[in-house]
């Protein structure tokens, strides 16, 4: 999982 606030797709 990615950290909070992280946007993989922006």
Curated annotation (Swiss-Prot):
UniProt keywords, alphabetically: Amidation, G-protein coupled receptor impairing toxin, Secreted, Toxin
Gene Ontology terms, MF aspect: toxin activity
Main localization, broad class: secreted
Subcellular location per the Swiss-Prot or TrEMBL entry: Secreted
Highest taxon above the source species: Eukaryota
Similarity section: Belongs to the bradykinin-related peptide family.
Protein name: Nephilakinin-2
Organism: Trichonephila clavipes (Golden silk orbweaver)
């Amino acid at each position: 999982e990615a950290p909070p606030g992280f946007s993989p797709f922006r």
